[in-house]
């Protein structure tokens, strides 16, 4: 087997969002195909999974972080190392939706740039009767961030794989555009704006 065919690219993904929004449930459903019903606040858990995304094998290193404010400093360290982010809120909690902007701004500050590969995730879409955040609000916020939007249900495994796959696709797009910028030595033609060609996806 050649080196090219045996090489598997690793992607460092970070789950970010308030407490109780289902970050751990999404991660465990993706990694283990199992729904965790009880809520046990996470400090830090790391998971790895190899999968094929768009005909290319990828090793996903997923870091599930604490949503509580007291772990903010620890979370910043994870943000520095992360390549792509899932910004998760619960559609049944307006507070968790409003907190997302704070998490987004924290990543921007830590990364020292306005854009990074990410997907905005509205979780618990199976609880439609308890919805406090409309799908349109999610789409609008994602448009403001310049990222994709998807609604998921860890319990019913709706769009779970797609949420993680979209972050990997975004990392690939971002890296390719960075390479294009690097090769554009004379500044004659800029690489396309990362945020300009994003579209929102919804189940």
UniProtKB/Swiss-Prot annotation:
Known catalysed reaction(s)?
A: GTP + H2O = GDP + phosphate + H(+)
Q: Which domain of life is it from?
A: Eukaryota
Q: Which residues form the propeptide?
A: 201-203
What stretch of residues is annotated with the motif Effector region?
39-47
A Gene Ontology annotation in the biological process aspect, one of them, is: signal transduction
| Activity regulation summary | Alternates between an inactive form bound to GDP and an active form bound to GTP. Activated by a guanine nucleotide-exchange factor (GEF) and inactivated by a GTPase-activating protein (GAP).
Cysteine methyl ester-modified residues are 200
GO CC terms, sorted: plasma membrane
Indicate the enzyme's highest-level EC class: hydrolase
Q: Which UniProt keywords apply?
A: Cell membrane, GTP-binding, Hydrolase, Lipoprotein, Membrane, Methylation, Nucleotide-binding, Prenylation
Coarsely, its chief localization is: membrane
- Cite the GO molecular-function annotations of the record: G protein activity; GTP binding
Provide the residue positions that the database annotates as binding GTP: 17-24, 64-68, 123-126
Any idea of its EC number? 3.6.5.2
The record's section on InterPro entries has: P-loop_NTPase (IPR027417), Small_GTP-bd (IPR005225), Small_GTPase (IPR001806), Small_GTPase_Ras-type (IPR020849)
Question: Do you know which PROSITE patterns this protein is assigned to?
Answer: RAS
What compartments host this protein? Cell membrane
Give the positions of lipid attachment, kind S-farnesyl cysteine: 200
Topology of the protein relative to the lipid bilayer:
Lipid-anchor
Instruction: Name the NCBIfam families for this protein.
Output: small_GTP (TIGR00231)
Q: Indicate the family of this protein.
A: Belongs to the small GTPase superfamily. Ras family.
**What PANTHER family does the record point to?**
RAS, DI-RAS, AND RHEB FAMILY MEMBERS OF SMALL GTPASE SUPERFAMILY (PTHR24070)
Name assigned to this protein? Ras-like protein 1
The lineage, from the top, is: Eukaryota, Fungi, Fungi incertae sedis, Mucoromycota, Mucoromycotina
Q: Which gene encodes it?
A: RAS1
């Amino acid at each position: 087997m050649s080196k090219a065919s045996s090489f598997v690219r690793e992607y460092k993904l970070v789950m970010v969002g308030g407490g109780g929004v289902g970050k751990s449930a999404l991660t465990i459903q993706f990694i283990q195909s199992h729904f965790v019903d009880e809520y046990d606040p996470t400090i830090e858990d790391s998971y790895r999974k190899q999968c094929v995304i768009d005909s290319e094998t990828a090793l996903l290193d997923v870091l599930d972080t604490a949503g509580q404010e007291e772990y903010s400093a620890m979370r910043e360290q994870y943000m520095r190392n992360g390549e792509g982010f899932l910004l998760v809120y619960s559609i049944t909690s307006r507070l968790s939706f409003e907190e997302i902007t704070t998490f987004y701004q924290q990543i921007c500050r830590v990364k020292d740039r306005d854009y990074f590969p990410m997907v905005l995730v509205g979780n618990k879409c199976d609880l439609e009767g308890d919805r406090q955040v409309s799908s349109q609000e999610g789409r609008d916020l994602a448009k403001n961030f310049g990222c994709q939007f998807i609604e998921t249900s860890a319990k019913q495994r709706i769009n779970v794989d797609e949420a993680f796959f979209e972050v990997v696709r975004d990392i690939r797009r971002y890296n390719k555009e960075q390479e294009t910028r690097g090769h554009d030595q004379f500044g004659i033609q800029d690489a396309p704006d990362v945020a300009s060609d994003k579209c929102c996806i919804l189940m």
